[in-house]
Amino acid sequence: MSLFSCAIKRYKEGNLILQICIGIVLGILIGIFSKDLAIFANIFGALFTGALKAIAPILVFILILTTICTKEFNHGSEKIKHIIFLYIFGTFLASLSAVSISFIFPVELVLTDIEKASTTSPAHIGEVFKTLLFQIVDNPIHALSSGNYLSILAWAIGGGFALRHCSNDAKQLFTDINEGVLKIVKFIVKLAPFGIFGLVANSVAQTGAAGLLSYIKLLIILVLTMFFVAFVINALIVFAYTKKNPYPLIFICLKHSAVFAFFTRSSAANIPVNMALCSKLNINNSLYSISIPLGATINMAGAAVTIAILSLAAAHTVGIEINFLQAMLLSVLAAFAACGASGVAGGSLLLIPLACSLFNIDYDIAMQVVAVGFIIGVIQDSVETALNSSTDVLFSAICSDNELNLKI
């Protein structure tokens, strides 16, 4: 095996988090000490962003269409229906919290060509809905090529419901296409260290410390919001449902589920850990055997927080004023989009343009925000997954008929 082949193999098998960290450090050093080299390195960043721009519309369309077309959500049990409601309601409250916190602590990012973006926001409800309706009825081919995510979303939902009763062979075809698109996405994300290296080098060379400080502030807001959801929103939901002190159960879920999910960065990979924890908690086996795998698919509070905060950061950066109606629409849209983000590498980040389209933010600007998300994703994605996965156990526990064992 040649030296080049060995290097590629070691890179493919390497730890992505460590590789991204190395890319960030090298990017900072290049940006500080060699502006010319940083400008050249930006080619990697531009290629990475371009690849994301190309695949994101196709991913959203295929992912949502396939999910609606193939998933069966009617499991019969009333308890399962309660858990599904809690998953969706909790995700919406997380999104609403993120929107509220973004208004209290607005974050502006250092982006390029922000003059491209729309800097006006419709003032009246009629104008908002008129804009939305005309975006929705766009030609689907044009929507995919131009990144009109509202139209993509509408056609994907319509197509998904229209195809729910198609043959199993047809559904399998869509599932296979979906898997193919996901493999392409995983390949692009595997190249993230090179793209992030170029983006960080160029950002440091062009803006100095200002760009990095805006990233750090954004990351702090994201992490604190997810902590707020874990310790306040989830606590209120548990208390409302059980009328008992929620924190002993919350701390058990965080200790035995969130810690593992933080390092695996995958809700699906954490399913065995969660099921073992449910068994220790004495939750009904017939309940958690369905609710835990289902939660790994649709319970995405952390993803909703990411989508909402980064979308509003884009709006604040380009100077768009968001009214109350648009804020509520964003909360709903972020929650809905988050439910389709499972199983996709960087899924919540790739759905940010969908939310940005609500504010007429230029597609290129939205993809720059996605790139920023990948830069801070080393921590953001880990905390997001920890919140998502631990909440699966939390909501399963409060819906269980059995006496919970909290002495573990």
Swiss-Prot record:
Locations listed in the record: Cell inner membrane
Pfam entry (one): SDF
Keywords: Amino-acid transport, Cell inner membrane, Cell membrane, Membrane, Symport, Transmembrane, Transmembrane helix, Transport
Chief place of localization: membrane
InterPro entries referenced in this protein's UniProt entry, alphabetically: Na-dicarboxylate_symporter (IPR001991), Na:dicarbo_symporter_sf (IPR036458), Ser_Thr_transp_SstT (IPR023025)
Membrane topology field: Multi-pass membrane protein
Catalytic activity: L-serine(in) + Na(+)(in) = L-serine(out) + Na(+)(out); L-threonine(in) + Na(+)(in) = L-threonine(out) + Na(+)(out)
NCBIfam families linked: PRK13628.1
Function: Involved in the import of serine and threonine into the cell, with the concomitant import of sodium (symport system).
Protein name: Serine/threonine transporter SstT
Organism: Campylobacter lari (strain RM2100 / D67 / ATCC BAA-1060)
